[in-house]
Amino acid sequence: DFKPSNLRKRMKKAKKATDKARKILKRFDNLDILVCHQPPYGFLDKVSGEYGAPKHWRGKHAGSKVILKYIKEKQPEYVFCGHIHEEKGKAKIGKTEVYNLGMCGWKIVGI
């Protein structure tokens, strides 16, 4: 359950995860396939109440700006992500095909 008192702790944890993602992605210059937990910000990342998200998150984007920046700069062929279960599907960022697998558990994609 979401409790406002946990927000500061959760934001600190999220900042650490963002910093870690930034450091990891800097090590990889030209990936063909990126598999990550969060979708890129603004793509397949909108939260609904379908899976019990708190009201203040509903309708908002919850993807990663770090991942979006990497995709725009490096243009890997494919990105596979999850995290935002209700936004499963496919999107395109430049030449990159982005797949949010949602909660499907598996997906067959011809490469």
Language-model segments: which ranges?
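Active-site-proximal loop/helix segment associated with metal-binding centers of metalloenzymes
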Residues: 1-60
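Short, hydrophobic beta-strand segments that form beta-sheet elements in well-ordered domains
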Residues: 34, 78-81
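Binuclear metal-dependent phosphoesterase catalytic core
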Residues: 65-78, 85-111
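Short secondary-structure boundary segments
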Residues: 38, 82-84
